[in-house]
Amino acid sequence: MKEGADVKHKDTKKECEELWAKNKYYVLSKSHKVYLDIREYLKEKEVDILSLHEKIQKVRDIKESKKDFSNAILHVWGYFKKEASEIEKQGLFNILEEYMEGKNNQESVIKYINTLLKKYPNKYLQESTLLTGEQNETMA
């Protein structure tokens, strides 16, 4: 009986890790604090997919934070920085600065990142709900 429970636990843990992988940059873009809270939750011995789903869903109601969004974009940029040209880098930093100054919106920044993603494919980022805009589809 215990062995079956261990397998189920591993499956649940794996499901949670997959769900988190898809949503972590979205969560980070909304709240660094919630991002850290969820990371701590996932270190627990027992995790629950529905509980994780709820935690992720709750960030949808959090008011936009330019600082947290910018932080998430800089994390995502880390996947491109070795391949992208200086012009592409400057393009991102310019559009991000304009966003911080209120001259454009998150969609503009995400659109630019998605342009880089087409040029420099990355399966992990291609499944990120921050970049796909599929925040309603947070189940793994």
Where are the regions that the model predicts?
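Acidic, Ser/Pro/Thr-rich low-complexity regulatory regions
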Residues: M1-A140
